[in-house]
Amino acid sequence: MTRQWETLREYDEIKYEFFEGIAKVTINRPEVRNAFTPKTVAEMIDAFSRARDDQNVSVIVLTGEGDKAFCSGGDQKKRGHGGYVGEDDIPRLNVLDLQRLIRVIPKPVIAMVRGYAIGGGNVLNVVCDLTIAADNAIFGQTGPKVGSFDAGYGSGYLARIVGHKKAREIWYLCRQYNAQEALDMGLVNTVVPLEQVEDETVKWCKDIMQHSPTALRFLKAAMNADTDGLAGLQQMAGDATLLYYTTDEAKEGRDAFKEKRNPDFDQFPKFP
């Protein structure tokens, strides 16, 4: 099915589009298998931040331009002495900020993977909430081959997903795995023919959009709290505070302070 995606903002190295409640962020560097630069990542952070704040967006899809690659990780031609060097000549690893944003954004994020999801590209797949893979998808890590590694989500959280033995295999051997192998190890949620991958992804988004956004927000925060330590607890605590602010009980405390009177909290139930 052909659908008309609306461009919400123009970028140099990504696309940011919208369709019926779905925001789609596309890495647009197909000539290098959608490898990212600091600029690519900065643009993705901006787009994800906009999607987070946009009341019309319920679900976010991350993908790569074309059928050959989702993302092949950091562009090694941009790698300098202390990180990836952008137009400002400052070496940085801002992809770590992007990973964290994808984790804490209070909306489901789905990776739509066609072709290669390798290195840092596979880590982006790992940190997304769900993954719809085309049958031509290829997954793997290359860090130890090129003098790099991801000791955060790319290894620790990966081990939570596929198990410690398999995660060590993925990193120590730097092999590549096809879509069915990725499905078997729990790295993706489903595999569909390449020509159907966007249709299936949109279908999953539409199914998700039928459900309570507050419930989904708390479920994501709860699962993150289990794996992300105090940072995960902070996310869930913030969500709880936000929800509390919407109650009459919280408003009574606020209004009493503004009106310089004692709050009347006796009117609210004390649930067991």
Curated annotation (Swiss-Prot):
Hydrogencarbonate binds at Q141, T142, G143. Converts o-succinylbenzoyl-CoA (OSB-CoA) to 1,4-dihydroxy-2-naphthoyl-CoA (DHNA-CoA). Its EC number is 4.1.3.36. NCBIfam families: menB (TIGR01929), PRK07396.1 (NF005637). Pfam families: ECH_1. One of its GO terms (biological process) is menaquinone biosynthetic process. The keyword Lyase applies. Belongs to the enoyl-CoA hydratase/isomerase family. MenB subfamily. Substrate binds at residues 33, 72-76, 84, 116-120, 142, 148, 245, 260. GO terms for cellular component: cytosol. GO terms for molecular function: 1,4-dihydroxy-2-naphthoyl-CoA synthase activity. The record marks Y84, Y245 as: Important for catalysis. It catalyses: 2-succinylbenzoyl-CoA + H(+) = 1,4-dihydroxy-2-naphthoyl-CoA + H2O. Its cofactor is hydrogencarbonate. The gene is menB. Pathway: Quinol/quinone metabolism; 1,4-dihydroxy-2-naphthoate biosynthesis; 1,4-dihydroxy-2-naphthoate from chorismate: step 6/7; Quinol/quinone metabolism; menaquinone biosynthesis. It comes from Staphylococcus epidermidis (strain ATCC 35984 / DSM 28319 / BCRC 17069 / CCUG 31568 / BM 3577 / RP62A). Gene3D superfamilies: 2-enoyl-CoA Hydratase, Chain A, domain 1 (3.90.226.10), Lyase 2-enoyl-coa Hydratase, Chain A, domain 2 (1.10.12.10). This is 1,4-dihydroxy-2-naphthoyl-CoA synthase. InterPro entries: ClpP/crotonase-like_dom_sf, DHNA-CoA_synthase_MenB, Enoyl-CoA_hyd/isom_CS, Enoyl-CoA_hydra/iso, Enoyl-CoA_hydra_C. Keywords: Lyase, Menaquinone biosynthesis.
